[in-house]
Amino acid sequence: MNFSIEQYSKFMTLLDMLLHNLQTLHMSLEDSIKWLGEVMAEIGPNHSQKSEDFHVFEVKEANAIIDYLKISLFQHYRLYEFLFYSTREEIVIGTEQTIEVVKPADYPFPAPLEEGISLDTYSTFIEPLPTPDMEQKVLDQEQGTQEALLESEMREEDPLGGFTIDDVKSALERVTDEVLISMQKEISEKLQVQEEAFNARIEKLKKA
């Protein structure tokens, strides 16, 4: 139905009164249907002052409203009763967190394990600040490590230290000659095979 703004306002008033009767007056389904019938019975050409608020509806529109209430409010009346009357448990969703402050190092308990703690948290709250003595020890250790590496590198012998330039040249020439000789031999063998194959073909052509 295409209701006007005033008709929509009256319809919402009627629906609010039905819900008020259900929630506040605890009307049963039968009483609500009876009350609605009394209100709608006054709608028409000969309406009385009792239903003055709802005389904006025609009989056809009133029947459409009744049909709608049948499939909405009245069909689910028990559900609305449960909604208004039944007490429901209030569920409060929340979380509780217990935060333990890290005890000082001189406390008679072992320090907490570092596993499971992020590096930022450990560096900010747990790791002790370096003292000048500790910083000097770290620098000395780093310098000692670098000096040890340099000494070990200097002690390593050069694998070519016992050879002269002439020795290296002669070794390279010898290796080069061996490689070239093997390649020449392989090429000669392949050429010989091809030559024999060509000769055989020439002999066949002569005989033909």
From Swiss-Prot:
GO terms for cellular component: centrosome; cytoplasm; sperm flagellum. Disulfide bonds: none annotated. Signal peptide: none annotated. Its main location: cytoplasm. The keyword Nucleus does not apply. It is found in: Cytoplasm; Cytoplasm, Cytoskeleton, Microtubule organizing center, Centrosome; Cell projection, Cilium, Flagellum. One of its GO terms (molecular function) is calcium ion binding. Pfam families: CLAMP. One of its GO terms (biological process) is sperm flagellum assembly. Keywords: Calcium, Cell projection, Cilium, Cytoplasm, Cytoskeleton, Flagellum, Metal-binding. InterPro entries: CLAMP. The keyword ATP-binding does not apply. Testis-specific. Expressed in spermatocytes and round spermatids (at protein level). Coiled coil: none annotated. Calcium-binding protein. May be involved in the control of sperm flagellar movement. PANTHER family: CILIARY-ASSOCIATED CALCIUM-BINDING COILED-COIL PROTEIN 1 (PTHR28457:SF3), COILED-COIL DOMAIN-CONTAINING PROTEIN 189 (PTHR28457). This is Ciliary-associated calcium-binding coiled-coil protein 1. The lineage of its organism: Eukaryota, Metazoa, Chordata, Craniata, Vertebrata. The gene is Cabcoco1.
